[in-house]
């Protein structure tokens, strides 16, 4: 049974500005595994990755019904499988979490559906 659905739309350039103002922004948003991947990217791909993880975590918090204020960005880890499909590797939710991250131009959109396991 679906118990939550969260959607987030994020302007990539806004995340880039935040990162340029405060480079530790990436370490606040990303887990260590995510940060290692982030550091392997360069330029626009690096910022796009950071914005995607930010958006995904915001969408997850909305699906939980709590907003990010009651969660830490470190509580949620979003990785990708060998084909590039994102998945939630770690979170406080014990059921199944479905995630989609889409980039287009200066925007990234994420959708998270939380499903209670029977």
UniProtKB/Swiss-Prot annotation:
Chain positions recorded as Mg(2+) binding sites: 8, 58
Record's protein name: Holo-[acyl-carrier-protein] synthase
Compartment(s) of residence: Cytoplasm
Catalytic activity: apo-[ACP] + CoA = holo-[ACP] + adenosine 3',5'-bisphosphate + H(+)
NCBIfam families from the UniProt entry: acpS, pantethn_trn
Pfam family of the protein (one): ACPS
Gene that encodes the chain: acpS
The keyword tRNA-binding is annotated on this UniProt entry: no
Disulfide bond as UniProt keyword: no
Predominant location: cytoplasm
Names of the cofactor(s): Mg(2+)
Domain of life: Bacteria
Keywords, ordered alphabetically: Cytoplasm, Fatty acid biosynthesis, Fatty acid metabolism, Lipid biosynthesis, Lipid metabolism, Magnesium, Metal-binding, Transferase
Swiss-Prot/TrEMBL GO biological process terms: fatty acid biosynthetic process
Organism: Streptococcus uberis (strain ATCC BAA-854 / 0140J)
A GO cellular-component term linked to this record: cytoplasm
GO-annotated molecular function: holo-[acyl-carrier-protein] synthase activity; magnesium ion binding
Function: Transfers the 4'-phosphopantetheine moiety from coenzyme A to a Ser of acyl-carrier-protein.
């Amino acid at each position: 049974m679906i118990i939550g659905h969260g959607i987030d739309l994020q302007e990539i350039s806004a995340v880039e500005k935040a990162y340029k103002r405060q480079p530790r922004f990436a370490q606040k948003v990303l887990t260590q595994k995510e940060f290692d991947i982030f550091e392997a990217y360069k330029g626009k791909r690096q910022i796009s990755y950071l914005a995607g993880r930010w958006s995904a975590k915001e969408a997850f918090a909305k699906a939980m019904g709590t907003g990010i204020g009651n969660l830490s960005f470190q509580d949620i880890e979003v990785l990708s499988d060998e084909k590039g499909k994102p998945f939630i590797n770690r979170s406080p939710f014990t059921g199944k979490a479905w995630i989609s991250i889409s980039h287009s131009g200066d925007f990234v959109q994420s959708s998270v559906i939380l499903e209670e396991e029977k």
